[in-house]
Amino acid sequence: MARYIFITGGVVSSLGKGLASAALGALLQARGYKVRLRKLDPYLNLDPGTMSPYQHGEVFVTDDGAETDLDLGHYERFTGRPATKADNITTGRIYQDILTKERRGDYLGATIQVVPHVTNAIKDFVLSGNDEYDFVLVEIGGTVGDIEGLPFFEAIRQLKNELPRDHAIYIHLTLLPYIPSAGELKTKPTQHSVKELRSIGIQPDILLCRTDREIPKEERRKLGLFCNVRESAVIEARDVDNIYAVPEAYHAAGLDDEVLAAFGIEPRVPPALASWHTINERVRNPEGDVTIAIVGKYTGMKDAYKSLIEALSHGGIANKVRVKLDWIESEVFENEDPAPFLEHVNGILVPGGFGQRGAEGKIRAAQFARERDVPYFGICFGMQMAVIEAARNLVGITEANSTEFGPTKEPLVGLMTEWLRGNELERRSQSGDLGGTMRLGAYPAMLKRGSRVSEVYGGATEISERHRHRYEVNTAYKDRLEQHGLKFSGLSPDGVLPEIVEYADHPWFIGVQFHPELKSRPFEPHPLFASFIQAAVVQSRLV
């Protein structure tokens, strides 16, 4: 039977519960255990799909088409286990399911209440589908004391009593701030956070304390005494130079040993951390640097591009170089020459996005890369802008545009109205809902034999990648674009939807309709990112 580890947070938000959960999952996995990670999000949205990137950050898409929290990206990258829609749930989804059952009459006239109906739904979600796993790590979003989180805390409180003895523990991630004027770490915020947790019936078994320095023995003793945990269970979560150093740092601090001890488990074997050590050696001791410009719309909120940042880092690890990112708001050069902003970089990446704001700047970035032979990687919206640039400046279709921006005589990019998902036809309309109505999840693509992208994928002629988009390049313009050098080297199996474009006579210019960053791992960098950074390395030696 699976054992459960519930991870909560206190004092402040954004302490890194998702990263801590992923790192602990990786440590348990490195000891030979089968691990599953799940996220409970207390907000009322059904999913983050329609939330602003400035508020929520990236929307991470799973193979089965779920739009989920970015923490699931950490889970995948650290454990290699693909997440599914069954690994993330929100208050909104729970309420929707309960109200649907109530309308059907499933509750036989009962009064629907937070306890027991909402808490039971949360417990059912947490316990479902875990038979094949040794450990299930469950992260509760938000911080202790948030009103919207109370049903989730109540549910995990009940679960510990309902599960067999020694089958559930609580880890509380907290902050130990250093006050320079006092010259010491302060434990009071953590004490009050644990007091709040205990007031709702949850006694943490382990304290994971975020800090920028070593925790003195006296402070450990104080935390153990006032928070009612063993001194050995006060774990130091020291700041590290890169996120892939976290598993080794947490192991050195004794987190995985303390977790096993809390369950009464004798460690099988020491964790196999050699691969993590290799990654960190490459990150800390690169053989060179490359600079990549990210020309985007949400550059003020780096979390909006979380998987992208990590995938570029993985490309650097594969090539033993440090990837420096130059964030450029695409509006900056909508009406001026992009050269002063881009002539120093070794590669240009235009990521996914929505809406007209900044689009012309992205088109100019694609033109600069094409004309100057700078490696260009266009992802989703970035591919569409590269196609519009080619249509305008190579084919001569000066009014080429996307219907996403309004009516146009030359719709190079248009709304997808139907596509196949397996054997089922899915349809969308301009007037439909925004939430959950995109082409979402993993779809196959057929690669042109002998194309550069086929070579990047090791000679493959069929791939599967994750999508999140409503608009698609119009194949009616395919022949004219190919006559001017822009090759459609990847199509959907039915040949209707363009998936990949490239210039054969360019050092490296590839646009993809999907999001390859979602499948990149530190141990297994996505081939497109590894190849893109390799091209940037070559470019850096030419400058």
Curated annotation (Swiss-Prot):
SUPFAM superfamilies: Class I glutamine amidotransferase-like, P-loop containing nucleoside triphosphate hydrolases. Its EC number is 6.3.4.2. UTP binds at residues 13, 186-191, 222. GO terms for biological process: 'de novo' CTP biosynthetic process; pyrimidine nucleobase biosynthetic process. The keyword ATP-binding applies. Residues 1-265 are annotated as: Amidoligase domain. The keyword Metal-binding applies. ATP binds at residues 14-19, 71, 238-240. It catalyses: UTP + L-glutamine + ATP + H2O = CTP + L-glutamate + ADP + phosphate + 2 H(+); L-glutamine + H2O = L-glutamate + NH4(+); UTP + NH4(+) + ATP = CTP + ADP + phosphate + 2 H(+). Belongs to the CTP synthase family. Homotetramer. This is CTP synthase. The lineage of its organism: Bacteria, Pseudomonadati, Pseudomonadota, Alphaproteobacteria, Hyphomicrobiales.
